[in-house]
Amino acid sequence: MTRIFGSVLADSATIEAFERLMALATITTPNVPELEALGGKAAMAHRNVAYLAKGGDAEGPEVEDRMVRPGHDDVVWRAPRIETRHTHGTGCTLSSAIATLLAKGQPLEEAIDGARKFVRAALEAAPGFGAGHGPMGHQAVR
């Protein structure tokens, strides 16, 4: 898939494998470039899978994440963009937090809401290490 600066992390064979895994997953969490690599919203609708389209890579003062599930209305979360360069690991953190909250028995929508709050708190608590896209402040979130 992709990461900061659009560098490709997966070739077409890897994307094909990912497509097979999406059919088994409760939800997938593509960012804007990943959603495009998977064929966009129309292709995802054709696959009949649930996904959370993350808006952190989009432009604008607000971040919008949209949960799309077959047979359900979309659920949208919006929040002011946190201006920081310490965004390394946001996607992995969000996915891991969703999985953790689902494993604790939370319904999907609540798990996503809680995971988004965790990521926002970690962004706000970033320790300021390194140059470029530094790490988030996971340690500050309890």
What kind of region is each of these model predictions?
Residues 85-108:
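Short, small-residue alpha-helix embedded
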Residues 9, 77, 136:
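Short clusters of hydrophobic/aromatic residues that line enzyme substrate/ligand-binding pockets
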Residues 73-75, 101-115:
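Phosphate-handling active-site elements
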Residues 109-142:
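Charged C-terminal helix
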Residues 57-58, 91-93, 97, 134, ...:
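Gly/Ser/Thr-rich beta-alpha loop segments that engage phosphate groups in nucleotides
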Residues 7-74, 83:
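Conserved phosphate/ATP/ADP-binding segment of small-molecule kinases
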